[in-house]
Curated annotation (Swiss-Prot):
Self-association and partners: Component of the FTS/Hook/FHIP complex (FHF complex), composed of AKTIP/FTS, FHIP1B, and one or more members of the Hook family of proteins HOOK1, HOOK2, and HOOK3. The FHF complex associates with the homotypic vesicular sorting complex (the HOPS complex).
Native organism: Homo sapiens (Human)
UniProt keywords, alphabetically: Phosphoprotein, Protein transport, Transport
Keyword Transport: yes
Name of this chain's protein: FHF complex subunit HOOK-interacting protein 1B
Transport as UniProt keyword: yes
GO biological process: early endosome to late endosome transport; endosome organization; endosome to lysosome transport; lysosome organization; protein localization to perinuclear region of cytoplasm; protein transport
């Protein structure tokens, strides 16, 4: 009973219930130092009489001795915790501590108690008591006890005893972690103490021991507060190891810390759900509130965040080792096969997990190894990135999750990612006519591209309501260069001194007034209009034009997006302007010869050190090298080798060159290898998009027919999927190729009418992200409407023109198209309003029965927001207060609330034969709403480039944060 009472008193010192250092203990009130010392010595004399007997006695009376020692020890340690240094010697030990150190009190008592372990009875309970007692002493002591060797020796003896095989229990684990956590806090306050806990090897050739560290490692992946407390304590030690080479070498060379972290991630990943149940049509990524509701995923994310923090603060040796173990022990053996599962549900889950991991990582070194895995690791002869690109062509949710993943990758502003996806195909400048190469660097200063994009808005989607009166002083801005004015009906007025590229800004300001450029749920273009007042219901003439007068907000958002990309790309290795890197192929240089000396299998397995050396040599002598000899990609500044298919010379042979290849010297073997790898890549890509094909999908156009054929057809036999003859598999690429990524994006974009509204939101957002990049090669490819491309290369303008024609043809064939278009606009606006508004008055919350996600489902407004890049459409959709329809039946989209998970525009009966037609019409009408907004966004981005690029590309602004070479700011 006495022992239980003692435990109950110690239990109050557990986590969350520890007595503050300034509070009085429940045991005897402190008297003067002389009295305390006398009482302390009296307790010690009682203990010494028991200790001097010949070991513990199992005979009757032995248990009484153990209980007496325990009681006296508790009283002594309570007095010792209250001991203070005398005023005459403030830096020395207090009288009680000095006596305890002289008598070696702690070690002698602990050694005697540990002898009872040999009897095998009550070991677990006694160990928990000892841990609690020492934790109380360390946490409540008013003197720096750890400075004294006898105290450290006693603690190390106890920690060593905790490594003996003892039945584990929650109380024992909690006591051990709590004591270790307190010790780590004390050591963090005095870092010089850390090396005193590093014990020398017990025998020659053995490894040193750091029990303070090794006893915490087994708890690193534990669930709940216990695991979190262990991880916090380990982080303190990691931060201390950064300044201690001895401790850093111990952790890297003599501990299993890094392997435990990496293998723990693998084990935790295997317990994640293999299928994510998401009935909502708009789900495309895992948000924080999603994974917090899944214990297995929450535990994995805690461990991943811990790895991220360790790499951030640990010693460089530990950082490098942990990164290598995560790559070789988690990414390659676990994530690689998981991304290539045969089940579509498993592929969706693994892709969503990968996107979440990339979005959650903040440390450049860890992010670098994830990107190295995506860009360079090969699974079944093709890279992970190629597999993910192919899945964009799927017509299932796999497409949405893949688009979300690439959105996250582009948000990183990593040179290597964009190089592998797009730039390496544009660098040779084979996609443009020879006479057009100098125009790659041209900047559209007069808004001609914006005018062209806005002219593609289908007539059936334009708002013809009377426009508000315009002040006469702004009439000069509506000149022939204005994108929205018919130049044939405008009388040209003398141009003012203001640059014409600012005319559109001035006209928008005169129309809509001025407002702070900060993000807001309402359009600045409508802020001065009474139609946008929250308390006013829009008139019937105004209702269809809710999204018409928002171009100024698109300009502001485009300016922010382009500025962000310019800042992030300022440290890239080349401007990619058609001259640097050089588009002209050159003879094989020394770097190529060095690479060609390696056998093919050795080239695929070049070590990281060799990759760095080859990268340095290539950069030193590659000023005049061609596109096949670009400097190897840098993963956040770390040189690496070119992936297969990108490291060889790319030449475009003329007609009849096939017969000449046999006579080319051995030095040209790289060209054949490149062609063969490209063909293998195209065949392999066909295995990625396993999603179901839409029965409503029309025949595809001629755009990049060689590449897109592989996304949709099995490799054997290559059926006649496209309308033009296919290139045979043994034929070298004889036509310009802009890469599989742009090919699949353009093909998906051209089929906007068949895509769901959610796919189109993600797809247009991804294209807008690419368009914001300042590299002239990419900017001219997407936004230069005057550029003349090769006949086999389809431009973005052609793709958009095709979509425009399809929308107009659909509108002409649909009698009730205006009514459906109005309903679709109202639905999108109301849907965004539901999730932007705060409070219960905003409308009913969307319902969800998904067991994975316990919170509200993502809204269209959040899809439009695109998590950082284009919140424009979301704010426009949220600008109106929900108003019931004129017939009092709400918006009439699906007979329910505007937040229903699957809106249906048509309700022409429930027969199965009607469902396909209803889906086709619904997707087409939503496309007609999204397409004009996308054109406005592209027009605004093209104008933002003209205003932004000349300034930020030449100067660097202070306070923009540290930039990482090769990857830009990872967390802008």
């Amino acid at each position: 009973m006495e022992r239980m009472n003692w435990l109950s008193r110690l239990a109050s010192r557990g986590p969350g219930h520890r007595i503050p250092q300034g509070a009085n203990l429940q045991t005897p009130v402190m008297a003067d130092p002389e009295t305390c010392l006398m009482v302390f010595k009296n307790h010690w004399s009682q203990v010494v009489r028991i200790l001097e007997r010949q070991g513990p006695r199992a005979a009757p009376g032995g248990a009484d001795d153990l209980s007496a020692v325990r009681n006296h020890t508790y009283q002594m340690l309570t007095l010792l915790a209250e001991d203070r240094a005398v005023p005459s010697a403030p830096t020395g030990p207090g009288p009680l501590l000095e006596f305890a150190l002289h008598e070696d009190l702690l070690t002698r008592v602990l050694t005697w108690q540990l002898q009872w372990d040999e009897l095998g009875d009550g070991v677990e309970e006694r160990r928990a008591e000892q841990l609690k007692l020492f934790e109380m002493l360390v946490s409540e002591a008013r003197q720096p006890l750890l400075r004294h060797g006898p105290v450290r020796e006693a603690l190390l003896t106890l920690l060593d005893a905790c490594g003996r095989p003892v039945p584990s229990s929650p109380a024992l684990d909690e006591g051990l972690v709590l004591l270790l956590s307190q010790l780590c806090v004390c050591v963090a306050q005095e870092p010089s103490l850390l090396e005193f806990f590093l014990q020398p090897p017990p025998e020659p050739g053995a490894a040193p021991r750091l029990l303070l560290f090794s006893r915490l490692v087994p708890f690193v992946h534990r669930e709940g507060t216990l695991g979190q407390q262990a991880r916090d304590a380990l982080l303190l030690l990691m931060a201390l190891s950064a300044g201690s080479p001895t401790v850093g070498r111990y952790i890297a060379d003599h501990s299993y810390f890094c392997p435990v972290l990496a293998t723990g991630l693998s084990a935790l990943y295997s317990s994640l759900p293999r299928k994510i149940e998401v009935p909502g049509d708009d789900w495309h990524c895992l948000r924080r509130e999603d994974w917090l509701g899944v214990p297995a995923l929450a535990l994995f994310m805690s461990s991943l965040e811990f790895c991220n923090a360790v790499i951030q603060v640990a010693h460089p040796l530990v950082q490098k080792q942990l990164v290598d173990y995560i790559h070789n022990g988690f990414l390659v053996p676990v994530m690689g096969p998981a991304l290539h599962k045969t089940s579509v549900e498993e592929m969706i889950a693994s892709t969503a997990y990968l996107e979440l991991f990339l979005r959650s990582i903040s440390e450049p070194a860890l992010l670098r190894t994830f990107l190295r895995f995506l860009l360079l690791h090969r699974h079944d002869t093709h890279t992970i990135l190629d597999t993910l690109v192919a899945r964009i062509g799927s017509n299932s949710r796999l497409c949405m999750v893949s688009l979300s993943l690439f959105r996250t990758l582009l948000n990183l502003s990593c040179e290597d990612v964009l190089l592998q996806l797009v730039l390496r195909y544009l660098v040779p400048c084979n996609h443009v006519m020879l006479s057009q190469k100098p125009a790659v660097r041209d900047v559209d200063l007069y808004g001609r591209a914006a005018d062209k994009f806005l002219s593609l808005i289908p007539r059936c989607c334009r708002h013809h309501a009377p426009s508000p009166p315009r002040p006469e002083h702004a009439s000069w801005a509506r000149g022939p260069g204005s994108p929205s004015v018919d130049s044939s009906s405008v009388t040209t007025v003398p141009r003012p001194s203001t640059p014409s590229r600012l005319a559109l800004f001035l006209r928008q300001q005169s129309l809509g007034g001025s407002e702070s450029p900060g993000p807001a749920p309402c359009s600045p273009g409508l802020s001065a209009s009474p139609a946008s007042s929250p308390g006013r219901r829009p008139t019937p003439a105004e209702e269809p034009g809710e999204l018409e007068d928002n171009y100024l907000e698109y300009l502001r958002e485009a300016r922010r997006g382009v500025d962000r990309c310019v800042r992030a790309c300022r440290t890239w290795s080349a401007p990619y302007d058609g001259e640097r890197p050089s588009p002209e192929p050159s003879p094989f240089g020394s770097r190529t010869k060095k690479r060609s000396l390696l056998p093919e299998e050795d080239r695929n397995n070049v070590g990281e050190g060799e990759e760095e050396e080859l990268g340095r040599r290539g950069r030193a002598g590659g000023a005049g090298e061609g596109p096949g000899h670009l400097p190897p990609p840098q993963l956040n500044g770390v040189p690496g080798s070119w992936p297969e298919g990108a490291k060889k010379v790319r030449l475009v042979p003329k007609e009849g060159a096939g017969e000449l290849l046999e006579g080319i010297s051995e030095g040209m073997a790289g060209l054949e290898g490149f062609g063969q790898e490209l063909r293998e890549l195209e065949v392999a890509l066909s295995n990625g998009g396993t999603g179901s094909e839409s029965p409503l999908e029309p025949p595809l156009p001629l755009e990049e027919e060689e590449a897109y054929e592989s996304f949709t057809c099995p490799p054997e036999p290559p059926g006649p999927f496209l309308s033009s003859p296919l290139r045979t598999l043994n034929q070298l690429p004889s036509q310009p190729f802009t890469g599989p990524f742009m090919a699949v994006l353009f093909a998906k974009l051209e089929n906007m009418l068949q895509n769901s509204v959610y796919v189109n939101f993600l797809l247009t957002g991804l294209v807008a992200q690419l368009a914001c990049h300042p590299q002239p090669l990419l900017r001219s490819f997407l936004l230069n409407t005057n550029m003349v491309f090769q006949p086999s290369v389809k431009s973005l303008l052609q793709v958009l023109g095709s979509v425009k024609n399809k929308i107009e043809n659909f509108a002409a064939s649909q009698e009730d198209f205006p009514a459906l278009l109005s309903k679709a606009k109202k639905y999108l606006i109301a849907r965004g309003k539901l999730d932007w508004a705060e409070g219960p008055a905003a409308g009913p919350a969307p319902r969800r029965s998904d067991p994975l996600v316990k919170s509200r489902r993502p809204s269209l407004g959040e899809l439009l927001l695109r998590h950082a890049h284009s919140p424009t459409r979301a704010r426009q959709a949220a600008q109106l207060v929900l108003q019931p329809g004129r017939d009092g039946a709400g918006l009439g989209l699906s007979g329910g609330s505007p937040g229903a998970s699957t809106p249906v525009l048509l309700t022409r009966g429930g027969a199965p034969e009607r469902q396909g037609e209803a889906l086709r019409v619904k997707n087409a009408v939503y496309c007609a709403v999204i397409f004009p907004e996308f054109l406005k966004e592209l027009a605004a981005i093209s104008q933002a480039h003209a205003v932004t690029s000349p300034f930020l590309l030449e100067t660097s602004e202070e306070g923009s944060g540290p930039l990482i070479s090769g990857c830009g700011p990872l967390n802008p």
